[in-house]
């Protein structure tokens, strides 16, 4: 059985997501990849195997807009030709592939096609008009793809149950979210210039989005006298959607964080915070666990494993008072045992072999 892993996007966490899955099959010569990257060349830098094809497409505003209506013909043609060349039996579309809905459905008539659903529902967001339009069109295309394929994969147990209710006649599969740790992160030791002399901070890491509830932890560190004596670092690109002022104990690094900076950023943090209002799945837990940094996360379904596996504590989603109290409790606690558990959890749950075996079982059903 010849398998093709497809990713046409490396935006946000999709690059690490796809490359980690592809790298899980590094030794399998019957598993190929077909990926499309932009000027960041994420896949070229992180995929270990040469058993595939990498195409290039600029991440311009024009390309983003036109892709909502017309997928690049050259890429569609190349994908179909590659499937024939390698005598592919199974195709797994890893990263939504928003513009390629018709192509995916068409291929599902000739191949065994799997499609990974990342976010079944749109997250809370404050966006300008053209971004709202693009967002709406994107989710419309994703809905078409879900309707048109027979095999759907998700990394969220709650989403798995919802998909089974929505599509009782389809095959719905679950596998654990892969680690977002790549070789650029493990080998990197670049210090963010904004953190000169700053140590033992509480870290929020990730793109700033409304559904991630960043304003909750910001307000907690602004208003509580004890938290005012501690440092909060908010690190990630994206539009700051809430009013923010300059405080000595709050450092905002509002830019893209290079992979080479992530090790320093986490190694010098005391703990990590994820105050999400909603979340179906996320790879951020793998990063905290890899570096052994205790977690404070909201109790939305995906993050409830934090308390279950003793990797930190959960607070009631959207509740600033509960978040504040949990922060104050954990900041004065001995965190060494949690750190050890996190690293053990990472080794047993985020290994490449675990991902490989899970997917092979799915493909063979």
List the model feature ranges, each with a label.
Residues 252, 309-321, 327-335:
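Conserved acidic donor-binding segment of nucleotide-sugar-dependent glycosyltransferases
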Residues 264-280, 290-293:
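Acidic donor-binding loop of glycosyltransferase active sites
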Residues 5-6, 70-71, 79-100, 111-114, ...:
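Short N-terminal targeting/anchoring amphipathic segment
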Residues 7-12, 23-70, 97, 159-164, ...:
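N-terminal strand-loop element at the rim of the active site
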Residues 194-212, 218-221, 232:
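Conserved donor-binding/catalytic core segment of Leloir-type glycosyltransferases
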Residues 241-263:
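Nucleotide-activated donor-binding/catalytic signature segment of Leloir-type glycosyltransferases, i.e.
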Residues 80, 132-152:
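Membrane-proximal helix-turn-helix segments that form the acceptor-binding/catalytic region
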Residues 147-187:
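Donor nucleotide-sugar binding/catalytic pocket of nucleotide-sugar-dependent glycosyltransferases
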């Amino acid at each position: 059985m010849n398998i093709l892993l497809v990713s046409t996007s490396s935006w946000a966490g999709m690059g690490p997501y796809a490359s980690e899955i592809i790298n899980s099959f590094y030794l399998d010569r019957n598993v190929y990849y077909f990926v499309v990257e932009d000027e960041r060349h994420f896949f070229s830098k992180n995929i270990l195997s040469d058993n595939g094809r990498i195409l290039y497409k600029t991440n311009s505003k024009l390309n983003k807009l036109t892709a909502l209506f017309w997928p690049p013909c050259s890429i569609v043609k190349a994908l179909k030709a590659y499937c024939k060349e390698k005598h592919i039996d199974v195709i797994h579309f890893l990263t939504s592939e928003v513009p390629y809905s018709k192509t995916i459905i068409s291929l599902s008539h000739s191949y065994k096609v799997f499609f990974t659903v990342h976010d079944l529902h749109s997250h809370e967001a404050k966006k300008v008009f053209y971004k709202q339009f693009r967002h709406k069109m994107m989710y419309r295309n994703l809905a078409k793809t879900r309707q048109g394929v027979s095999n759907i994969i998700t990394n969220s147990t709650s989403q798995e149950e919802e998909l089974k209710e929505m599509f009782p006649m389809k095959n719905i599969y679950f596998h654990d979210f892969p680690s977002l740790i790549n070789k650029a992160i493990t080998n990197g030791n670049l210090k963010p210039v904004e953190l000169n002399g700053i140590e033992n901070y509480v870290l929020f890491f990730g793109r700033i989005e409304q559904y991630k509830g960043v304003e909750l932890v910001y307000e907690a560190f602004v208003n509580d006298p004890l938290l005012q004596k501690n440092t909060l670092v908010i690190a990630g690109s994206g539009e700051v959607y809430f009013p923010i002022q300059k405080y000595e104990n709050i450092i905002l690094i509002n830019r893209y964080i290079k992979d080479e900076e992530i090790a320093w950023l986490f190694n010098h943090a005391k703990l990590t915070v994820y105050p999400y209002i909603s979340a179906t799945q996320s790879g951020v837990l793998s990063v905290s666990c890899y570096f052994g940094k205790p977690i404070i996360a909201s109790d939305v379904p995906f993050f409830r494993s934090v308390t279950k596996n003793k990797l930190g504590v959960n607070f009631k989603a959207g509740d600033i008072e509960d978040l504040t109290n949990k922060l104050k409790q954990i900041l004065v606690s001995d965190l060494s045992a949690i750190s050890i558990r996190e690293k053990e959890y990472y080794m047993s749950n985020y290994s490449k072999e675990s991902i490989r075996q899970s997917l092979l079982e799915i493909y063979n059903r």
